[in-house]
Amino acid sequence: MITPNVRRFLNLLCGEYSNQQQAFDNPPLYAHIFLRYRSLPQLKPGSILLEQTYAVDPKNPYRLRMIRAEEQPSGAIKLWNHTFQDPARFAGATFDPALRRSIQTPDLISLDQCHYQVVEQSDGYHGAMEPGCQCIVRRDGKDTVLVSSFHLQGESLQTLDRGHDPITNERCWGSVAGPFRFKRTQSWAADLASAWL
């Protein structure tokens, strides 16, 4: 069972998103990326699969995560972030129902210190790393602290991920030109209709 607040959020989130227009308008600054969010009803309530791929290589995700949405006493939604023991095994699972159904809890690794907090405001849902989180991302042989946020409103999803030096706070990687701007190209909210009732 999930709360009405979480179900409303997931109904809006679940689908495929593309930043095609942004990538075409600014090819040096933005790669063309797909984000795909699909429910995983065999796991704990609120569990969804996130697959991120480059448009030029849609079958090989560069990021695969399981995120579990859970309402907190404050009314905010916590997104528990997990990676996979063997990500390659589940590559393409957003397109493959049998492969999605095969994902089980032992396949997952909790990314402690990398969970998100989502708050609904008048202009949609705003998510960011939980206060006090120190999510370490290793990039180019160096540990960096992830600073990540998103804004979901209607068919629009904006994301901004940057890695900072843990000592100097200097930006080491991530967008220099502002957030990635995605539009939903298809909704998979229907998948949620019978999930976690």
UniProtKB/Swiss-Prot annotation:
Domain of life: Bacteria
Keywords: Lyase
Enzyme nomenclature, EC number: 4.-.-.-
Keyword set includes Lyase: yes
InterPro entries for the chain: CpcT/CpeT, CpcT/CpeT_sf
UniProt keyword Lyase present: yes
GO MF, one example: lyase activity
Annotated function: Covalently attaches a chromophore to Cys residue(s) of phycobiliproteins.
Protein family per UniProt: Belongs to the CpcT/CpeT biliprotein lyase family.
Record's protein name: Chromophore lyase CpcT/CpeT
Species of provenance: Synechococcus sp. (strain WH8103)
Lineage: Bacteria, Bacillati, Cyanobacteriota, Cyanophyceae, Synechococcales
